[in-house]
Amino acid sequence: MERLERATNLLEISVNKQDDLLVLDCNDITVFSRFVHLYENIDKMSESAKKEMEDVKQKFKDIEDDVNPAQLMAYINVHVMTSQKIMEELDKVFGENFCRKVFRENYELNPDFVPDEIALAELVDSLVPIMEKAYGERIKRTQNKYNAGKRGKHTKTKDELIQ
């Protein structure tokens, strides 16, 4: 019987001191696509949070207290909601409970832990070179394998295809 052998092309990355793993399937180009989408969504979420902060500021503009507990809680809620949305997006890209793995020590100390936007931004920034390496090389190999120059006489220019 014939047997088809296929490279799994899985990349394992330790995400904490306990060596919990993020496993990337480098054959799945949609992971890279979702990561790019995540990056775009974070920018949108950041802009939305700024607008919500302005709304909170306007809502409490007539209160003279320097420190108003309700206003403070409203600001904190905006930050918490933004962080939770970013965590949901990260989990969509890298798998369920990805953030819990990365911040495992924090969750062990406090099960209700929510990382702030800075910690999440640093996490995303640390993932960029990993994603570029994992998927950039794959994209380059694919382009080299199927580039127009290697197809020789079957290659047509854009103008030839239009005619």
What residue ranges belong to the model's regions?
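C-terminal charged interaction modules
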Residues: 88-163
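Short N-terminal mixed-charge amphipathic segments
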Residues: 1-71
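Intrinsically disordered, low-complexity acidic Ser/Thr-rich regulatory segments
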Residues: 65-86
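Detector for Asparagine
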Residues: 9, 16, 27, 41, ...
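Intrinsic-disorder-associated interaction segments
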Residues: 24-31, 35-38, 42-49, 75, ...
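Residue-level detector of functional hotspots within protein domains
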Residues: 8-10, 84, 88
